Each structure stands twice: as C-alpha cells, then as structure tokens.
Regions:
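Short N-terminal signal/transit or membrane-insertion segments
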Residues: 7, 63, 230-231
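Short, glycine-rich nucleotide/cofactor-binding loops
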Residues: 3-6, 132-136, 213-218
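N-terminal active-site beta-alpha-beta segment that forms phosphate/nucleotide-binding
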Residues: 18-187
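A generic structural signal for well-ordered alpha-helical surface patches
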Residues: 8, 12, 31, 51, ...
C-alpha cells in the first residue's frame, strides 16, 4: 500500500497507473485536490494542480468529473473553511462511488439470475481488463453483479481476459475473484471469440472509462473486438458504469481522446522468476517498434445494455436520458 502525501504524488500515481480504473482515478484526483489545498491554499496553486491532475490521463472521464466537482465546491466557500470542505467533498465522491457500484451489482444480478433460471447450470461470464474493487472504491463495476450473484448462491464461472499489455485481467481481476472464491480461468485476449462460437460464454460484462450520451463505450483496448465477437454469436454484451463515467458533452466516439502509452509496456513484460524476484524482459527484437493505444471505442449498436446505479437501459441517448435527465 502506497501513501500519497502531496498533489504531485497523486498526479504521478495516476500517470504511472499505480492507481487505475476510472472510478478510482476519480477518487484519487478528488483527494489530490485536498492535498493541494493542504499544501498551499492559494487559488492559483490549486487551479494549476487541478489542471495537472486532469492532464495526467486523458481518456477516463471520471478524472475530470471529480476535479471539476471539487473545484466548483471550493469556488463557493471562504478560504478559512477550504480544507474541511475539500475533505468532506472528496469523501462524498468516494462514498457515492461505493454506493453506486453496489447498486450496479444489484441491477446486474437480475440479468445473471435470469440466465441461471433458464440454464439451471453455471453461468459463464467473460470480462475484460479489471473493473473490480481494485479499480473502484468497492465492489467494482463489471464485477459487482458477479459478486452479488455469488453471494446469492448462483454458480458462476468467469473467463478472465489477460488484457495485454499490462495484464490487468490476469494480475488483478483473477486475484480479486480468487479472493472472493469465485471460479475463474485466465485466457489469452484472442480466445473469447472461439469460446463464444462453442457456446461457452453466456454473457459478457465489461467496465468503461468513458461512455458517451449516445451509448458509445470507450474502454480498455480489445473491448471492441469482444463486442464484435459477441454480436456475431448472439452473446449479450453489457457495460457496467456509474453515472460519473458518462460524458454528456462529446457526441461521437471518434472524438474521444485516446491515450497512447509508453511502447515499453508492450515490448517488455514483468514477472516473477524462480526466486520470486520481479524481472522485466524484452520480448520483441531490438529493432522492432511498438504502438501502445490504451483504449478503443465500441459503438452503441454492439452494446446490449448499460448497467448503471439507477437501473439498466439501452445504450442510446434515449435510454440514458430516461434514467438521468
């Protein structure tokens, strides 16, 4: 566990993916503003810190949402109250996220339960990347329905995409599921399609870093290909998200800023050697180049539905407006 004591440490933690997952990035950014206020309550310093936080990762909308909410709250108060109010607002943001994720699980449970009642056998769920309690304040988004189903006694098994290049599925989602004693199997990223063809996937549930008001979904690279495979094989493809992940301003997926990360994340892998020491090794020829796009966009037409804290809706402007406007 790493303690963050300054706003600069918060920015670096987000940028270096020491914290990751859209809701958790938002919570970290909120407390980053608290740390900025604690360091120097000069409005100019706080504004510059807010800008740097927003710029630390461009794709996940929760980051900007949380910083904007914090700055709006601080603009309404006197300087002698600023630290207490900032701390209270950051806590409210995190408490809300936990409750939202719990509600996502309650609503998503209905879908899993319906599949189980028809199948009368283990429900096989495919997920991508990590959208669990390691990516949120608690419960997770995509994993929350799974945890609720497991707690209710519904037998579930999860296909866990390894999610190259950082292997968040293999390293984080599988770890979470093991801790919750939920059966899971790690698969290579390109395995999902054949599993769907074989009828071994009942439902896909993924998270999202930014969902547009028209239902387009921006998530970890590889999500789009899973949605295409699911569509071709008539497998339901759901996206789980809190309302803080909705971008009401950008109207087309092509306009979402897609983060390009260091190519070394792709060309090198980290792991434990036989002595349990962490090692990083190059897996490509020295002269080869690599491009590391962190996210892709899944058009709304491939999304069966959005699982939110207020219920389930179709991935469309009309569906989202019915719940949130």
């Amino acid at each position: 566990i790493k303690e963050l004591k300054t706003v600069k440490e918060s920015i670096n933690a987000i940028k270096l993916m020491e914290v990751r997952g859209a809701p958790l990035i938002g919570g970290t950014a909120a407390y980053g503003i608290v740390l900025a206020v604690q360091e120097n309550n000069d409005p100019e310093f706080i504004k510059k810190s807010a800008d740097k936080l927003i710029q630390s990762r461009p794709t996940a909308i929760n980051l900007k949402w949380a910083v904007d909410r914090m700055m709006k709250k601080l603009s309404e108060i006197n300087s002698d109250q600023i630290l207490d109010i900032a701390l209270k607002e950051a806590k409210e943001i995190c408490d809300e996220d936990e409750k939202f994720c719990e509600n996502i699980g309650i609503h998503g449970l209905e879908i899993i339960e319906e599949i189980y009642n028809k199948k009368k056998d283990t429900v096989n769920i495919l997920t991508h990347c990590n959208a669990g309690w390691l990516a949120t304040i608690n419960w997770g988004t995509a994993t929350s329905p799974i945890y609720h189903a497991h707690k209710k006694g519904i037998p579930v098994h999860v296909w866990v995409d390894e999610t190259r290049p950082r292997n968040q599925g293999a390293n984080l989602t599988s770890y979470e599921l093991n801790e919750e004693e939920i059966p899971n199997t790690i698969i290579a990223d390109n395995t999902g399609g054949i599993l769907m063809q074989r009828g071994e996937v009942d439902i896909c549930i993924v998270g999202t870093d930014r969902t547009l008001s028209n239902g387009d979904v921006c998530n970890k690279i590889g999500t789009y290909l899973k949605a295409l495979a699911a569509n071709d094989n008539n497998v339901p493809f759901y996206v789980a998200l809190p309302s803080s992940t909705i971008d009401w301003e950008i109207t087309e997926g092509k306009n979402i800023p897609i983060e390009i990360r260091n190519s070394e994340e792709l060309s090198h892998v980290e792991g434990l050697d036989e002595n349990n020491d962490i090692k990083k090794i190059l897996i490509y020829p020295n002269k080869s180049k690599a491009m590391n796009l962190a996210f892709d966009v899944t058009p709304a037409k491939y999304v069966t539905g959005l699982i939110t804290e207020k219920g389930i809706c179709e991935a469309s402007s009309e569906g989202l407006k019915r719940l949130f406007k």
